[in-house]
Amino acid sequence: MNAELTELIFILDRSGSMGGLEADTIKGFNHMIAQQKEQGKKVNVTTILFDDEVDIIHDRFPVEIIEPLTEKEYYVRGCTALLDAVGTAIEKMDSVQKHLPETHRAGKVIVVITTDGLENSSEHYTQEQVRRMIEARKECGWEFLFLGANIDAGKEAEKIGIARNRSVTYENDSRGVELNFKAVGRAVSKAAAAAAVTDFIEDDWADEIQTYKR
């Protein structure tokens, strides 16, 4: 296991209800990536955009080569196939980890899920399937963060096996989106710099998001 390598999987909602926040989302994502580049740690990034389809735009790219996200990639449309996006991400990363030599496997895997609404269009994975997948990967030390707007994020996270202290309900406005990416960026930076390969996300990771009220 390579304790110096972090795999970051970012699952980002681009369904129609995200309309009006495209520029804020793009700006926040790009700032987060720039933050990781500045830190200089070994981070591979997988970015998955989802609506009623799942689109992988970065497939384990070293963070230093990632180009800024633009409106060509991030544009809103469609419904919310959240379970399909999460299931696809886990199976893909799980396959990679299993087939790499032991010394090339990431010591830390962080899956960040952001959505502004409830699941409503998945066709390939059920809630129970995803819950079991997440529970199994948590046993291997993977961390999952769930950020949700317009929903009870803690309740929805628990349905798929993510603890409440790894979830947060955010305000779906410009400032709320900005705080989301800042919080995730800090959490990832601390995790990438940590020597430990378990429990590398701090429990206060979402405090700034929680204190913001529109």
Residue ranges: model-predicted function:
Residues 1-214:
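Acidic, low-complexity intrinsically disordered regions
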